[in-house]
Amino acid sequence: MKFRRLMLYLLLLMLGTTVVSAGQATDKLPATGTHRSPSSDGASVDFKTPQDGDIVPPAFTVTFLVSGMGIAPAGSKIDNTGHHHLLIDVTELPDMNLPLPATDHIRHFGKGQTETELTLLEGEHTLQLLFADYSHTPHDPTVMSDKIRITVSANAPPPNEDEE
């Protein structure tokens, strides 16, 4: 009888601890679709390289610019900051009220990177930058570049070091 009570007590104790732990863990996760961090007035993102209409080699450097906001890594909840997301050949924008998914077409730069080496197949491509907050959710209002079009060609001239 004492053994059963002891086992029941231990079982309830373990169950209670699990429920409390689960509640604490979910408190640290960003709410999905419930909040968008405000962006600074006049905030913008753009490409330093490449530019719209450029012909680039299959492997090339993409450099991001941000104005009016600071850069902070994903997970760092700091007002007026965020990090870049690169949209590659995206024809339909994702839901701006939800965290951006990480896919081959939506690249996350959650460490605060402002440059990346990109390799694309030859042909026409589009690139667009989207700035998002600590939880990968776009700001409100959205801070997004215009879409640029580039052509990837093995015959592209090497980048001019003076232009970068």
Please identify what each model-predicted range represents.
Residues 9-18:
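Bacterial N-terminal signal peptides
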Residues 27-57, 160-164:
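Short, compositionally biased P/S/T/A/G/V-rich stretches that sit at domain boundaries
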Residues 60-64, 114-116, 123-131:
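Short, well-structured beta-strand segments within conserved domains
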Residues 65-76:
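Short amphipathic, basic-aromatic surface patches that mediate peripheral association
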Residues 76-84, 144:
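Short coil-to-beta strand junction motifs in C2/discoidin
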Residues 93-95, 132-140:
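Short acidic/polar inter-strand loop motif in beta-rich domains
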Residues 96-118:
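A beta-strand/beta-hairpin structural motif
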Residues 141-163:
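Short beta-strand elements
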